[in-house]
Amino acid sequence: MGASVKPAARRNARQFALQAIYSWQITKENVATIEAQFLAGEKYDEEEHRAAEPALAAPETDVAYFRDLLTGVVLSHTELDSKIRPYVSRPMQDLDMMELALLRLAMYEMTRREDVPYKVVINEAIELAKVFAAEDSHKFVNGVLDKAAPHVRKK
């Protein structure tokens, strides 16, 4: 990957991975099925609990990165939750589902994708929260990740 991957392609991959992770959390559907829906150009519609509108049709999307994020988060969600838990002031089951998806995605990148600077991970999570989560969720996500970063990112 390295320098040849454009930031916009990674940003799109994160956005679609977040939506796919959220879909998985809601439906508990097989990750391969969710991935296939996104690769076929579908996006999860929360209101209808079904896939809707084009997803990976964005002109620049790092599909390999999307797959890594989605599969990695789903397969390691229990471990990721244990890394998030110490930095959250309320029970994990009380977290908004989108906030949980954001934190899992960012924690996966912080712990498994050392090629991505932790400040980039935090900034991208904040930007995704501003678009997809509740009004002040970006502040919560920023606080949790800021506290966690020095403890979970290997130097």
From Swiss-Prot:
One of its GO terms (molecular function) is RNA binding. It comes from the Bacteria. Disulfide bonds: none annotated. One of its GO terms (cellular component) is cytosol. Pfam families: NusB (PF01029). GO terms for biological process: DNA-templated transcription termination; transcription antitermination. InterPro entries: NusB-like_sf, NusB_fam, NusB_RsmB_TIM44. The keyword Transcription applies. Keywords: RNA-binding, Transcription, Transcription antitermination, Transcription regulation. Signal peptide: none annotated. NCBIfam families: nusB. Belongs to the NusB family. HAMAP family: NusB. Involved in transcription antitermination. Required for transcription of ribosomal RNA (rRNA) genes. Binds specifically to the boxA antiterminator sequence of the ribosomal RNA (rrn) operons. This is Transcription antitermination protein NusB.
